[in-house]
Amino acid sequence: MLIIDGKKVSIDLKSELKVRVDEHRAATGKVPGLTVIIVGEDPASQVYVRNKAKSCKETGMHSSVIEMDASTSEEALLSRIRELNDDPDVHGILVQQPLPKQIDEFAVTLAIDPAKDVDGFHPENLGRLVMGHLDKCFVSCTPYGILELLGRYNIETKGKHCVVVGRSNIVGKPMANLMLQKLDATNCTVTICHSATKDIPSYTRQADILIAAIGKAGFITADMVKPGAVVIDVGINRIDDPSTKSGSRLAGDVDYEGVSAIASAMTPVPGGVGPMTIAMLLKNTLQSFERANNLQ
């Protein structure tokens, strides 16, 4: 079985991005800038933000973090976003989830300039994706990362049956729409399964490409997978494991041991889709910079 190594691809991609950033710095004296806003002190969010800042530094991009108190009002957050929208040195704006209850997440998404929405969550970017205008939008980072993996590993997709398990706005919906597009690493027949789908295994067993993004550890088992299928595991779940020092470990939505015995290719957890998400965030930020400076 082929292991689709997202960690390796993300390192390669960041090296390629650094070359482009260095070229732009030499030619213009400018570099892409990413600003992350974090509201509150969620420990997991703090880790994600640190990882993003580290990756920016590795590629030569400028990054900044705006920390706001958990009691911050929605209007105060929207005001900061408007300031960043008007800042020519900021090319990507990311508001780290989750947000406190007093803040409407959709209002925050709408407030971000679509040209700086490097998370790809703004309705304008999602609409352009659905319409097939990928050269004029930002694609949500996790689906975009999966597309990059399929392309770099030369996975045949044209005319294949892709089954996406999960319908979240972050992964499932944009992933399904992306796989419908007429691109080298897409152009599939697409089925979406979700919590209300009856007899999910009857669909997953038809998949040439199975993408699991349901948020349940080990949900996809070997008897649900077509022999020879390509399996992309988006899930990141922490489960108890007394054998580890911490007492827990990360597990995907797919039973790796069982499914790896029959799949032709598969992403591991960790080290599969996860590292690609941040890499594609940087790629989107660079693309925003290039569009803003007419460098494409």
Swiss-Prot record:
Its domain of life reads Bacteria
Q: What is its EC number?
A: 1.5.1.5, 3.5.4.9
Its Gene Ontology biological processes?
A: L-histidine biosynthetic process; methionine biosynthetic process; purine nucleotide biosynthetic process; tetrahydrofolate interconversion
Transmembrane portions of the chain: none
Q: Which Gene3D superfamilies match?
A: Leucine Dehydrogenase, chain A, domain 1, NAD(P)-binding Rossmann-like Domain
Reaction catalysis annotation: (6R)-5,10-methylene-5,6,7,8-tetrahydrofolate + NADP(+) = (6R)-5,10-methenyltetrahydrofolate + NADPH; (6R)-5,10-methenyltetrahydrofolate + H2O = (6R)-10-formyltetrahydrofolate + H(+)
- Give the record's keywords alphabetically: Amino-acid biosynthesis, Histidine biosynthesis, Hydrolase, Methionine biosynthesis, Multifunctional enzyme, NADP, One-carbon metabolism, Oxidoreductase, Purine biosynthesis
Where is NADP(+) annotated to bind?
G166, R167, S168, S195, I236
Which pathway is recorded for this entry? One-carbon metabolism; tetrahydrofolate interconversion
The reply to whether Hydrolase figures as a keyword in the UniProt entry is yes
Q: Which GO terms describe its cellular component?
A: cytosol
A Pfam family recorded for this sequence: THF_DHG_CYH_C
One GO MF annotation is:
methylenetetrahydrofolate dehydrogenase (NADP+) activity
| Keyword Protease included in the entry's annotation | no
Q: By its UniProt entry, which NCBIfam families does this protein fall under?
A: PRK14174.1 (NF010771), PRK14186.1 (NF010783)
Concerning its family, UniProt says: Belongs to the tetrahydrofolate dehydrogenase/cyclohydrolase family.
Q: How does it assemble?
A: Homodimer.
Its biological function?
A: Catalyzes the oxidation of 5,10-methylenetetrahydrofolate to 5,10-methenyltetrahydrofolate and then the hydrolysis of 5,10-methenyltetrahydrofolate to 10-formyltetrahydrofolate.
* Protein's recorded name: Bifunctional protein FolD
Q: Which species is this record about?
A: Chlorobium limicola (strain DSM 245 / NBRC 103803 / 6330)
